[in-house]
Amino acid sequence: MTLQEIKDQVLAGFDISSAQATWLANMADSEALYAAAHEITITCASHEFDMCSIINAKSGRCPENCKWCAQSSHYKTQAEIYDLLPAEECLRQAKYNESQDVNRFSLVTSGRKPSPKQISQLCDAARLMRKHSSIQLCASLGLLNEEELRALHTAGITRYHCNLETAPSYFPTLCSTHTQEQKLATLDAARRVGMDICCGGIIGMGETMEQRIEFAFTLAELNVQSIPINLLSPIPGTPLENEKALSEEEILRTIALFRFINPTAFLRFAGGRSQLTPEAMRKALFVGINSAIVGDLLTTLGSKVSDDKKMILEEGYHFADSQFDREHLWHPYTSTTDPLPVYKVKRADGATITLEDGRTLIEGMSSWWCAVHGYNHPVLNQAAKDQLDKMSHVMFGGLTHDPAIELGKLLLPLVPPSMQKIFYADSGSVAVEVALKMAVQYWYAAGKPDKNNFVTIRSGYHGDTWNAMSVCDPVTGMHSLFGSSLPVRYFVPAPSSRFDGEWNPDEIIPLRETIEKHSKELAALILEPIVQGAGGMWFYHPQYLREAEKLCKEHDILLIFDEIATGFGRTGKLFAWEHAGVEPDIMCIGKALTGGYMTLSAVLASNQIADTISNHAPKAFMHGPTFMGNPLACAVACASVRLLLDSGWAENVKRIEAQLKEELAPARKFPQVADVRILGAIGVIQTERSVSMAYMQRRFVEEGIWVRPFGKLVYLMPPFIISPEQLSKLTSGVLKIVREM
């Protein structure tokens, strides 16, 4: 074996073996080892340095006999003794550390575990800190159970720290009053309640290099992503007071090995690092340290935050604005106390996204399915610039303008012939709201005010606003929390006949029975035609739409198509209704309408709908968004629609579809995979179990691709301008990561 082979193995995403790690530990050329570890660090690990500070919230004599610990009651040391600090003092120190750009603040207590009263006090302190500070909260409080950890998590503590300290084979030599199995039980409980975990240990306690390797592999098996590495500072009075300090070369070699074994983790320098020379500290940052506990430690002095920051920046790491982002910006579908990771983007061009750290990602999501032309397109850029020189916005009430008129002229030839009226809206969700209101007002105007409810199919998604949520699946959808507050709609099973399979006539029966029973109160049936998007990425048979249309006409019910996600070529047809040849009464479009540049949607309706509403009091449709018909958005939309029609979109989508079918096919044989389905420029891998979004997204980024999975779905919706080579990188990266599950 060679260093190059082992390094390439890690860079390719494969784990190394214990034998390979031992070979690395014994190689003579330390500098070559450090350089290889550095390459792994800059390729696989985060470049954004993570700083944590701690507060020794309670110090005293502990019943455990850990040989390294100054707070053990078994040894005579000079460690301070004091009870739990007041919550106000914890807050004061948390706010100070936040002002120093520290990411995390950890509450630490001595002893096996706090009393129930102290747990309650610590929860109160956490709530106080969350109320007055945005710093992320961690805790290291000993061997806790799931109930105690859940209380802490509810109070705002998002990460739990419990060190295994050393290799499983060596731990009993250092402590006999508790076991590593008890520590592992605490870590497992923390994960079950939704906490992230932090777990590492101390080197230099008499263990061998082989045992350090064993320890690093133990942490890798646990998939720990925050690994504190403490250097023993022998404390007078403890059994290890005369332990010889490790050489700087041995410390650096250990860090390198930890990086080879845990390539993506935050290796967090913690206690004892003050014994290193500045040169060795810089070398440690070079080799693999990308995180640190700053300030004073528990029983040993630490370092000044300002000094640490200066050195960290000089070694090529950065403190991005993502800290402010984490603390103050609430991203979609995530927590503020334990947010999903975000990756800061520097720019985007074509089918690529460039992160602030320089990494380039192939775009697989089209920014939630809207950027069909890719990014930074000169035609769309110019359209926006030209319109800015004229006007960016005027109200659409009582005024009109060329961009809105021109966009309407472009859209009408593309949509069903019966669609003759266009109502501009702000977003996809708002378009659905408008469509539902339009249906209700239509029946009111038609003299049937009792027809004010809706029917739809399960596993649907129509948006995040109030009435849009009401027609999303109330059980499997993302809005079940609001179910008891939303208007009650009628839901029938989604058709299981595949788009490219045989049609089962029985699939229409539940819809027929529901419509027959409730037709007098139903205003409309709303459907995502052919493709159910965020509700499950399912492609159903076109015959369902034909049968549904017959039922709607037979029972005097409007048909609404939500083409927000499917419109503008995504399914291989310009709009998905074309697969079935079924024309709706009302249709919603959005997302790709502006090529992903600006938010804009439109609701299209027949003359019958519009005229009926307009000829009955109040003789107007009662909806008017502030930014309705925004001229800047309309101008870009005009350019986007023209660009799509002139770009050979149909050939591009056929090419993408063929390549997705060929290159995702191997996933059908994976034991982790339940289904693979392709339609147009949509590729879906459905897994047997739910995916970890944070973990898989990080792995996708490491592969140089941008994919955002959810639930049991890993899917691709690339821009239509993606090259075959870029698409191959996407598909190969997806297959690799799914295979790892």
Swiss-Prot record:
Signal peptide: none annotated. The modification N6-(pyridoxal phosphate)lysine is found at K591. Keywords: 2Fe-2S, 4Fe-4S, Aminotransferase, Biotin biosynthesis, Iron, Iron-sulfur, Metal-binding, Multifunctional enzyme, Pyridoxal phosphate, S-adenosyl-L-methionine, Transferase. The record marks Y333 as: Participates in the substrate recognition with KAPA and in a stacking interaction with the adenine ring of SAM. It comes from Bacteroides thetaiotaomicron (strain ATCC 29148 / DSM 2079 / JCM 5827 / CCUG 10774 / NCTC 10582 / VPI-5482 / E50). (8S)-8-amino-7-oxononanoate binds at W368, Y461, K591, G624, R708. NCBIfam families: bioA (TIGR00508), bioB (TIGR00433), PRK05964.1 (NF004624), PRK07986.1 (NF005940). This is Biotin biosynthesis bifunctional protein BioAB. GO terms for cellular component: cytoplasm. The keyword Electron transport does not apply. It holds the Pfam family BATS. Its cofactor is [4Fe-4S] cluster; [2Fe-2S] cluster; pyridoxal 5'-phosphate. [2Fe-2S] cluster binds at S106, C138, C198, R268.
